[in-house]
Amino acid sequence: MALKIRLKRMGMKKTPFYRLVVTEATSPRDGRFVEEIGYYDPTKNPVVLNIDEEKALNWLLKGATPTETTRALLSKAGVLKKFDEARK
C-alpha cells in the first residue's frame, strides 16, 4: 500500500479550494483518503496555506511521498526542513 500526500480539489466551478490529504496512490484525485492534513486556497489574496505540521511529519516519516505540487507547499510551510532534521 503506497501512500501519497496530494491535493484534493474542492470548491465551486472556477473557484478551486484544495485539501492536502494522505491517500493511497491508486485512488482517484477526489476519492477516498486516509487523513486530511491541511488546506490550500490559491484564490485568496494573500494565498491561504494551513498545514498541520505534526500530522504531515508523522506521515512523511511513515513513508508517504508527496506529489510535486504538495512538496512545494510543504517546503513553503517549512515542513520539509523539519523532516530532513528528524531523519538525521
UniProtKB/Swiss-Prot annotation:
The record's listing under Gene3D superfamilies reads:
3.30.1320.10
* PANTHER family documented for this protein: 30S RIBOSOMAL PROTEIN S16 (PTHR12919), SMALL RIBOSOMAL SUBUNIT PROTEIN BS16M (PTHR12919:SF20)
Q: Which Pfam families match?
A: Ribosomal_S16
Task: Please give an example of a GO cellular component term from this record.
Answer: cytoplasm
Is the keyword Ribonucleoprotein assigned to this protein?
yes
> Known InterPro entries for this protein?
Ribosomal_bS16, Ribosomal_bS16_dom_sf
Any one Gene Ontology MF annotation carried by this entry is: structural constituent of ribosome
The protein's superkingdom reads Bacteria
Q: Which GO terms describe its biological process?
A: translation
Give the protein family.
Answer: Belongs to the bacterial ribosomal protein bS16 family.
> Membrane: is it a keyword of this entry?
no
Q: Which NCBIfam families match?
A: S16
The record's SUPFAM superfamilies line, in alphabetical order, gives: Ribosomal protein S16 (SSF54565)
Q: Which gene encodes it?
A: rpsP
Report what the protein is called: Small ribosomal subunit protein bS16
List the keywords (alphabetical): Ribonucleoprotein, Ribosomal protein
